[in-house]
From Swiss-Prot:
Stated name of the protein: Dephospho-CoA kinase
EC number(s) stated in the UniProt entry for this protein: 2.7.1.24
PANTHER family in the record: BIFUNCTIONAL COENZYME A SYNTHASE-RELATED, DEPHOSPHO-COA KINASE-RELATED
Family matches, as SUPFAM superfamilies: P-loop containing nucleoside triphosphate hydrolases
Family membership noted in the UniProt record: Belongs to the CoaE family.
One Pfam family from the record: CoaE
Single GO term (MF): dephospho-CoA kinase activity
GO cellular component: cytoplasm
HAMAP family with a match to the protein in the record: Dephospho_CoA_kinase
Main location: cytoplasm
Reactions catalysed according to its record: 3'-dephospho-CoA + ATP = ADP + CoA + H(+)
Summary of the function given for this chain in its UniProt record: Catalyzes the phosphorylation of the 3'-hydroxyl group of dephosphocoenzyme A to form coenzyme A.
Species this chain originates from: Caldanaerobacter subterraneus subsp. tengcongensis (strain DSM 15242 / JCM 11007 / NBRC 100824 / MB4) (Thermoanaerobacter tengcongensis)
GO process annotations (BP): coenzyme A biosynthetic process
Amino acid sequence: MRVVGLTGGIGSGKSTVSGILAKLGAKIIDADLVSREIMEKGKEAYNEIVDCFGKEILDKEGNIDRKKLGSIVFSDKEKLKRLNEITHPKIIDKIKKMIEEEKDKDKVIVIDAALLIETGLYKLVDEVWLVVVDIDTQIKRVMERDGFSCEEALKRIKSQMPLEEKIKYADFIINNSKDLRKTEEQVRLLWQRFDRRSYFD
């Protein structure tokens, strides 16, 4: 079994790349989905987050409103740090279990995580694949996808590790600034060598 860590900044197009990899046969573990799951009512991180940030982050049904929580933590570095301290260990534990439960030993598992490096998830993988995009495209994508203003989009981008730092951890870089066909070509080339190698190691 091989484990790839797929990362990139918000709006870099990680989801596009993980979608291509899923079609090629990879098992995708989406860290954002895991994060959402552990915040659900009755799940691992729910009580701790509500105790820390107050009931004002809840919607009418008592669920954590991620937009409300986001507006708090992305305006205050200390609060973001506190949220990460609560959630990151639980996300790592859950993903470790998901990898351990995979029965197909020839499978390539891809951990799709914006915070792969910051959380320490990169220590679980054999290779780190970094998706990069030019800053103007990144801002535009975040604004369109999340309905943010330019200022809000920049705030989210700047809250993450700078690209120059992420590059230091990357084994391979996928440039997603151009059209989808170019991105697919890069991903297929990486997949072919990685997938082939998994059978001969």
